[in-house]
Amino acid sequence: KAMTATASAGYNYMQEGIEYAVSGEIPCVIVDVQRCRGENYATQADLMQARWGAAGDHEMVVLAPSSVQELFDHTIRAFNLAEKYRTPVIVLSETTIALMRENLVIPEPDQIEIFNRIKPSVPREQFVPYAAAPDGVPPLPSFGDGYRILHSINPHDETGDIHWKPEEYDRLYQRITNKIKANYEDIVRTESYYLDDAKIGLVAYGSESRPALEAVERAREKGLKAGLLKLSTIWPVPEREIRELANQCDILFAVEMNIGKYAGEIERVSNGACEVVRITKNRGLIHTTGEILADMEQKLGLSLR
């Protein structure tokens, strides 16, 4: 199994390799510890690059840890998803988390769920490298198993041979994207806090979900029916959960440590069901709870502190 890690600037140079991994269906895990340009200050500015940085038609799986424990747990899950769907998986960490010191529970090895790639069940002479199973994922032998392994970034047929037939090109990339789209239930993860009766919703991911949750709890102490939707998976977008929250709430606050990027996705998915307000910070520091509450106060005309 393959993994590498970088911090923002280095992630730029990995985009061609990620494109290759998508097209060649090569399972791997990339950890990007987001930081401000040239400095070790905190940010969530690589959000769109994690989804759209690589060229060509593709879906990306991107996980957003909010703690040291989640960074550990999400990395294990990233390997499982990469192996299951033969795709690169991004763990989008942040300087905030990288510099944290927190307790970490490491389970016993037999308590950790591990998914190993599905290998061919046919004899070597019958193996077709890109003949997909019903779930859209071709079995993948390991190097040394004796099977013919061929990886190519170029359009190819089931045998792995390069070609330029338009219908084969379309068939290939429809399958590569659909194997992610069709497994929404398995890939997408969110956490809900105080949402049962919420009329004011906060949506956050990564380290920003920490002060956002405290802001929700403080607002509730003041009688405001607030709740938090925490996104553990940010790509694919948790559209169902965001849409349900938008239909339930009068207003959604999108809390981010950038100039306001994922808010656009929340607005798109909400589709006018409620107002979406951006709470952004782009100063190399995580939001404080007070800053989030101050922005909520300004919009709602209430005193929450």
Language-model features: locations:
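A structural-propensity feature for long, helix-poor, extended segments
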Residues: Y41-E59, C249, A254
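Glycine/charged-rich beta-loop-alpha catalytic/anionic-binding loops adjacent to active sites
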Residues: K1-M3, V33-R35, A55-V62, Y194-L195, ...
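Flexible, low-complexity linker and terminal segments
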Residues: E83-R305
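Thiamine diphosphate
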Residues: K1-Q49, V61-E83
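Phenylalanine-focused residue identity feature
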Residues: Y13, Y20, Y41, W52, ...
